[in-house]
Amino acid sequence: MKLPIYLDYAATTPVDPRVAEKMFQCMTMDGIFGNPASRSHRYGWQAEEAVDIARNQIAELINADHREIVFTSGATESNNLAIKGVAHFYHKKGKHIITSKTEHKAVLDTCRQLEREGFEVTYLEPAANGIIPMERLEAAMRDDTILVSIMHVNNEIGVIHDIDAIGELCRSKGIIFHMDAAQSAGKVPIDVQATKVDLISISGHKMYGPKGIGALYVRRKPRIRLEAQMHGGGHERGMRSGTLPTHQIVGLGEAAAIAKAEMASDDARIGALRDKLWNGIKHIEETYINGDAIERVSGSLNVSFNYVEGESLMMALKDLAVSSGSACTSASLEPSYVLRALGLNDEMAHSSIRFSIGRFTTEEEIDHAIEVITQSIDKLREMSPLWEMFKDGIDLNQVQWAHH
């Protein structure tokens, strides 16, 4: 067993060896290294064919048409292109956008930028289980609302939104629906023929593909128009210029094909490991799951250990590669804004750990994790004056702390 045990699959996944092998075939002189836009010789034609195959593989994962797939550098760029692209193209129709307070920073900061440009954004509060209630979404809709951007699966707490219901509501009001699927593509079934979603952001490195590559699904019927954010050679039907990185695209395509073929078996195995982990630690006093316990992606478990300081817990769990929030904000000592939005106080938000399990996690690793977590919590609480006060029956919310 390799230490530390990797339980941070929501931050990134290792590239599947089958994906890495395919990628390597597109890099050297012996392989398919040509520029897919070079139409005058075989090297370019081979590269273009490899890109076309990958585009089809990604389209098949979400039951889309291959012409609806636009390659980007990742979900952050896809989110930027979708949200800014719609806002800039449809600004004459309206300047109101709806999103939620628990979105990834790539959505929130894009919306903040649009606010600086004169757009108006409504940030919806989730319910205590982390899911946006439909009535709140409907109540926020206005005549000048042009876009709703709600994530499929939350990156910190793993809850799954009812995208079918959101899609129906948006379509009935003539509002474009964008979905950030960085955490769900390849893990949760997505069918664009059944779900009325107009734009989907996809990330390669969250589904055992390479970093630095992603895709944006852009619906053709009814047709969604975007204003390009990257200008140049007019690649990707003018929506995203830049030489296509054949090796990364082939990697993303292979990752999508494997995910589609193995989704059900992966989901069952990973879900069983997640349940094993929770069943092994839920007996620890004052331990709580954050987010809905049922409507969640199989590999995610976000737990608050009350009366334990998050950073000291992270240090105590040095044998486990886990996080106290999203990797993109883990350098910050601020408590998770997602957990705060669920109504957790600073202390509870600070004492939370995100465990995310994936394709290469083993039973042995989960057994070891349970042991390490149990021992660490006991040890830290033994040293905690707050835990002692709580055990003595003192209501810590009533304590008047002296200010220095």
Curated annotation (Swiss-Prot):
Positions annotated to bind [2Fe-2S] cluster: 328
Annotated EC: 2.8.1.7
Compartments, record wording: Cytoplasm
Cofactor list: pyridoxal 5'-phosphate
PROSITE patterns membership: AA_TRANSFER_CLASS_5
Residues that bind pyridoxal 5'-phosphate: 75-76, 155, 183, 203-205, 243
Active-site residues, Swiss-Prot/TrEMBL: 328 (cysteine persulfide intermediate)
Pathway assignment: Cofactor biosynthesis; iron-sulfur cluster biosynthesis
Origin superkingdom: Bacteria
Protein name, UniProt field: Cysteine desulfurase IscS
Native species: Shewanella baltica (strain OS185)
The organism's taxonomic lineage, starting at the top: Bacteria, Pseudomonadati, Pseudomonadota, Gammaproteobacteria, Alteromonadales
